[in-house]
Each structure stands twice: as structure tokens, then as C-alpha cells.
Amino acid sequence: VHCLKYGLTTNNLLGIEMVTMDGEILRLGGKHLDAGDYDLMGVMTGSEGLLGVVSEVTLRILQKPATQRALLVGFDDTGSAGKAVGDVIAAGIIPAGMEMMDGLAINAAEDFANAGYPRGAAALIIVELDGPEVEVDVLIEHVEAIMRAAGASSVKISKSEEERNLFWAGRKSAFPAVGRISPDYLCMDGTIPRRRLPD
């Protein structure tokens, strides 16, 4: 969820020690993110254990943001929601996390988690903003204005950490929730260029 702002796992690895399938111990990476060699750590991370067993990692540690708040934004159509995602990024705002769900996932997740999702919405976007409290307050105003300009039918802003977690609990339960409706459900990660989301 937070890879938009903070990167993927591989972006936060400084080094790994791993054991290859033939028993060789390899040390990859170092103490700096910008090592000039091939991205072997990226290859190993992407292989998810197929090329060896990782026995030690050196990670980049980030300080927890002072404030984290989320917006739960409903739309009457997925095209407007897709456009809103691009509009937020085009405005120079990089949310800590941003996820979009369609109507089927919204209702399945709401049945499963009671997260307070708008049942009549055709699409839902969860936007998380983090940083100093004053900055987050300003960003929330900007993001809400962008969402409304893109056609948002509802906007709910988390008032507490518990409510923010509840917004995300619904999203995180979407896969098992849809699985209850269709046990043979197949989930695949896809990549869509932001400019094509409205399509």
C-alpha cells in the first residue's frame, strides 16, 4: 500500500546475505542505496526464494511520520475515480498510499469488515497522507478539492488512528471477502499507466 511514496521492498534493502541452492553464501549490496553494480538484490528479492534463501538483511529504516490520516472517497463511476488518481499525482502530491476498489470489491469488503464504505459507490479510493500535522491538514484540503473536482460523490476523512486503520482493514480484506462470493476467484497484480486509469 505504501510503495507509492516509500518504494517496494527492494527499494528499502541495503544488503542481503543469502544461501544459493548449491550452498554458496553470497553477500549482495552494501551500506548505500546507490551501489553501481547490477541490481542483483532486486533479482533475488523478485525471485521470492526461487534462487536462494535469504539468511540476513540490512534495511533502510525510516522514522514514523508524526501524523497519518486517510480519506475515503466514493465515486459514481470508475472513470472519474481513475482520473482523480492521476489528478492527485499531477498536482505534485505523493500520498503515503492510494488504492482504488470497484463496486463489487466495495460491497464484498463492507460485508466482511464493516469499514464504513459507501455501498452505492461504483468506485472507492483510499488516500493516505502523512507527515507533520500542519502539512497533512493542508494536503487533505488539496486532495479533497481535487477529488470533488473529479466528481467524488462522497468524501470521509479519518478523525482518529482507529478510523484510519478501519479504512485500510476493509481494503486489506477485499481478497478474502471476494473469495467468499466466488471461491475460485483468481487475483492478479496488474500495472496500468495512470493516464489510462479513466479508460
Region spans (language model):
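C-terminal substrate-recognition/cap domain of FAD-linked oxidoreductases
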Residues: 59-63, 69-199
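FAD-binding subdomain of flavoenzyme oxidoreductases
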Residues: 1-99
